[in-house]
From Swiss-Prot:
A GO MF term: translation release factor activity, codon nonspecific
Name of the featured protein: Peptide chain release factor 3
Name of the gene encoding the protein in the UniProt record: prfC
UniProt keyword Cytoplasm, yes or no: yes
Family per record: Belongs to the TRAFAC class translation factor GTPase superfamily. Classic translation factor GTPase family. PrfC subfamily.
Subcellular location: Cytoplasm
Organism: Staphylococcus epidermidis (strain ATCC 35984 / DSM 28319 / BCRC 17069 / CCUG 31568 / BM 3577 / RP62A)
Taxonomy of the source species: Bacteria, Bacillati, Bacillota, Bacilli, Bacillales
Amino acids binding GTP: 17-24, 85-89, 139-142
Length: 520
């Protein structure tokens, strides 16, 4: 297989959903159908103690949510698929956003009983903003939920995107019989003991079966004919432009509808995309020179070795272990000899990767999120990854003053991997941490204790709004007020932390020559 064929075989996507919609379950079942894992067990193992493949961090195992982004690669048919299992909690939008910068498509998982939920909407907007094609898997059809047309209408109205159902459910909950495949005109029964049923062009059963006289079957056929009469053909270009989402019904927990989805996904999902540089030049995946960017850094994936891994998306060409690359931020050459792939906490050495692949680079502190690595004589850097403005701030210190070394090492590593944002007061050097949501602080506290053996003391600062300053040279000492704190971020930029919107507006009126701005 030549380089062009290798790149065309890559499919890289993220799975997005609201917590408990079945995202991690779907991830596991995709791995199961690909043969990447031997057993697809129940993911939600709070009683059994059995944990999902993609939830490897201890706090994830304890709480049953994904709070980091795992990367899994597997072969299916003639394709090599990279799945990024995004954080499944609403507090982790910043890490999720960075993950979505590294994919070419997304799979949106929706609970049929709940429809579009807040986190789903938030993540969808990020995908829409980036023009990422979205596939929809409506999950838990073996439970009672909303009617199919109601769910499609909700997706179209709430998300402002057209839908195209690729299959259609027959019944729901206890009366769930199976799904009708629109393309093959077949009915796949939910129960294993049933055989595949076939329909003619008029949706009449070719075989004799008791379901023929069932009201749920009759309703499903009527609905399917209504969908067909709408006359809208599947438009792959609209999918690739982010204007249409193909919709699949199924039950991930029951292994039902997942393989049908996977088959359709590899047929219709985009191959690796070009990526824009800071100079607004598109770098094609087929460029022969290697390039890639770091979108995530994760410390202590293996607690025994206290390792640190930088997650890199290969943008163009081919990566070969041992190759020389240039880290553009420092303009220094380096030889990459330690590279790894992932299956959650299982890792193996990567000798070769091409555009679209996600690989891990062992990091001794060289890399930062957003770094560009290039081979050959290329000089460009990719556009920076956006940063979110925190909404919660805490003073933090070590409970035991004898643990200062471990305390500062832990904070440095967790800040570098993007788990938390770092600020420091100007005169007292008090460390203040910022987060998008409360759970980030809980995870930070847990990891400091579990990975660095440091108990931390955290105290709310009473500030909710962070604003950066465009004209830093105009800052004066008298600008600190009882309702604001002047701090520096990890890059030494000045930042004002304000108590509330009123305090922000008061400052802007009093010091009108100071130009404030926020991040995303």
């Amino acid at each position: 297989m030549n380089l062009k064929e290798e790149i065309e075989s890559r499919k890289t996507f993220a799975i997005i959903s609201h917590p408990d919609a079945g995202k991690t379950t779907l991830t596991e079942k995709l791995l199961y159908f690909s043969g990447a894992i031997r057993e697809a067990g129940t993911v939600k193992g709070k009683k059994t103690g059995k944990f999902a493949t993609s939830d490897w961090m201890k706090v994830e195992q304890e709480r049953g949510i994904s709070v980091t982004s795992s990367v899994m690669q597997f072969d299916y048919d003639d394709y090599k698929i990279n799945i990024l299992d995004t954080p499944g909690h609403e507090d982790f939008s910043e890490d999720t956003y960075r993950t979505l910068m590294a994919v070419d498509s997304a799979v949106m998982v929706i609970d049929c009983a709940k429809g579009i939920e807040p986190q789903t909407l938030k993540l969808f907007k990020v995908c829409k903003m980036r023009g990422i094609p979205i596939f929809t898997f409506i999950n838990k059809l073996d439970r009672v939920g909303k009617e199919p047309f109601e769910l499609l209408d909700e997706i179209e109205e709430t998300l402002n995107i057209d839908t195209y159902p690729m299959n259609w459910p027959v019944g729901m909950g206890q009366n769930f019989f199976g799904i009708i495949d629109r393309h093959s005109k077949t009915i796949e029964p939910f129960r294993d003991e049933e055989n595949l049923l076939h329909l003619n062009e008029d949706y009449e059963l070719k075989e004799e079966h008791a379901i023929k006289n069932d009201s749920a079957f009759e309703q499903a056929i009527e609905e399917m004919m209504l969908v067909d009469e709408a006359g809208e053909a599947f438009d792959n270009e609209a999918l690739l432009n982010g204007e249409l989402t193909p919709v699949f019904f199924g039950s991930a927990l029951a292994n039902f509808g997942v393989q049908n989805f996977l088959n359709a996904y590899v047929d219709h999902a985009p191959m690796p995309n070009a990526r824009q540089t800071k100079e607004e030049v598109d770098v094609s995946p087929f460029d022969t020179d290697f390039s890639g960017f770091i979108f995530k850094i994760q410390a202590n994936m293996d607690p025994k070795h206290r390792d640190r891994i930088a997650f890199m998306r290969v943008v163009s060409g081919a990566f070969e272990r041992g190759m020389d690359v240039t880290l553009q931020r420092t303009n220094k050459k380096q030889k990459i000899t330690r590279s790894t792939s992932f299956m959650a906490d299982d890792k193996e050495t990567v000798n070769h990767a091409v555009a679209g692949d996600i690989i891990g680079l062992y990091d001794t502190g060289n890399y930062q999120i957003g770094d560009t690595l290039v081979g050959g004589k290329q000089k460009y850097s990719f556009q920076e990854l956006p940063q979110f403005t925190p909404e919660i701030f805490m003073k933090v210190s070590a409970k035991n003053v004898m643990k200062q070394k471990h305390f500062h090492k832990g904070i440095e590593q967790l800040v570098q991997e993007g788990a938390i944002q770092y600020y420091k007061t100007l005169h007292t050097n008090q460390i203040i941490l910022g987060a998008v949501g409360q759970l980030q602080f809980e995870v930070f506290e847990h990891r400091m204790n579990n990975e660095y053996n440091v108990d931390v003391v955290m105290e709310p600062v009473g500030r909710k709004i962070a604003r950066w300053i465009e004209n830093e040279e105009d800052i004066k000492d008298n600008m600190n007020t009882s309702r604001s704190i002047l701090v520096k971020d990890r890059y030494d930029n000045y930042v004002f932390l304000f108590e509330n919107e009123f305090a922000t507006r008061w400052f802007e009126e009093k010091f009108s020559d100071i130009k404030l701005y926020s991040l995303l």
